[in-house]
């Protein structure tokens, strides 16, 4: 998935509108992922509470969106920009890269729900392509 200049500017503009709510987006998206795709819970079995809105879910949701924020700043070279995160997920945490797509979908759902006015069809396409590109960049070290 190649991001066009239009995609990049659309994502940056959308991020400018939604970034103040990034922690809430992350917490909701991660909570949804764990509830809707229970197989993803295996990575978080050390948490005392995996329910939506719990402390660990909120904390990790914040971390996830910190990664998305980083990706927005590295949008012109995601593979290099997200190299350390890819390394961490591939070798230290051994996360199956298919889970990045699942979480990307949950992020899209939450952005659509929280920002219906901003989530235009153009924003939807560009954010979807961006998150797919982020997932691909995170999977880079698995090869």
UniProtKB/Swiss-Prot annotation:
InterPro entries: Globin, Globin-like_sf, Globin/Proto, Hemoglobin_a-typ, Hemoglobin_oxygen_transport, Hemoglobin_pi. It holds the Pfam family Globin. Heme b binds at residue 89. Keywords: Heme, Iron, Metal-binding, Oxygen transport, Transport. The keyword Translocase does not apply. CDD domains: Hb-alpha-like. Involved in oxygen transport from gills to the various peripheral tissues. The gene is hba. Heterotetramer of two alpha chains and two beta chains. GO terms for biological process: hydrogen peroxide catabolic process. One of its GO terms (cellular component) is hemoglobin complex. The lineage of its organism: Eukaryota, Metazoa, Chordata, Craniata, Vertebrata. O2 binds at residue 60. This is Hemoglobin subunit alpha. Belongs to the globin family. It comes from the Eukaryota. Gene3D superfamilies: Globins. GO terms for molecular function: haptoglobin binding; heme binding; iron ion binding; organic acid binding; oxygen binding; oxygen carrier activity; peroxidase activity. Residues 2-143 form the Globin domain. Red blood cells.
